[in-house]
């Protein structure tokens, strides 16, 4: 348990930040799921729109450090490959 006033304040701030970061991570997952579901449904136009909406969100969360930049790149790359594969079918 934190003893100093500074440590107690940091503990309070960390709780608040953890809740906020969890919300942002959830938002990223939601955008990714929307894209994946559109791809699974086989609808190219919906999948493309979902992907275009997801990319800036993924990038923004990587910039903020919510997700690692390599993880963001991996998600974007895999989603883009799936959307392109859907276009060729």
Swiss-Prot record:
PANTHER family: 30S RIBOSOMAL PROTEIN S20, SMALL RIBOSOMAL SUBUNIT PROTEIN BS20C
One GO CC annotation: small ribosomal subunit
One annotated GO molecular function: small ribosomal subunit rRNA binding
Recorded family membership: Belongs to the bacterial ribosomal protein bS20 family.
Keyword RNA-binding part of the UniProt annotation: yes
GN (gene name): rpsT
Keywords per UniProt: Ribonucleoprotein, Ribosomal protein, RNA-binding, rRNA-binding
Any one biological process term the GO annotation gives: translation
Protein name listed in UniProt: Small ribosomal subunit protein bS20
Physiological role: Binds directly to 16S ribosomal RNA.
């Amino acid at each position: 348990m934190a003893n100093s006033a500074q440590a107690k304040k940091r503990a309070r701030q960390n709780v608040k930040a953890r809740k906020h970061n969890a919300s942002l991570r959830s938002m990223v997952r939601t955008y990714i799921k929307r894209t994946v579901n559109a791809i699974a449904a086989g609808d190219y136009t919906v999948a493309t729109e979902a992907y275009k909406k997801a990319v800036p969100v993924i990038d923004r969360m990587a910039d903020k450090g919510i997700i690692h930049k390599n993880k963001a790149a991996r998600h974007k790359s895999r989603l883009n490959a799936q959307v392109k594969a859907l276009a060729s079918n």
